[in-house]
Amino acid sequence: MTRISLIKPDDWHLHLRSGEAMKSVVGMSARQMGRAIIMPNLSPPVKSVSQAQAYRKEIMKALPTNSSFNPLMVLYLTDGTVPKEIEAAGAAPEIYAAKLYPAGVTTNSDNGVTNVTNIYPALEAMQKEEMPLLVHGEVTDPEVDVFDRESVFIEKILDRVVKDFPGLKI
């Protein structure tokens, strides 16, 4: 074999937004991609299985006729995410992962995690469910240079999560 052709690749980080904004872009993504990881940082964020399922229905309704596009839904982790919600997500085939947004680091992250230990019960459930953890890896410490925020996140937060949850898919 000398050549590989990807006819319908996957998009592993897609912001579709919602409403009219989503309707204006989802068709283009669906024509180019077979599947996509749908980012949950809407306003309000997609924090529950029922919200993810409703958002997926909105996406599917906006797709062009006969589209085979498969949106893979993601839950937005908060300090209040409970293991039962993760277990329910693990049982829902349309939900692929959950995402950690540190509070205040990016668009619509105000509801994000204030301290990673607050989501340890949810991470334990994710490890049991074999659900991937997606990460917006950045700290908000004003003492940390903007160009160092990702590396500091890895050193101070992610390394600890990897150590504490060795079976978690990150």
Give names to the regions the model predicted:
Residues 1, 84-100, 106-169:
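Histidine/acidic residue-rich metal-binding segments in metalloenzymes
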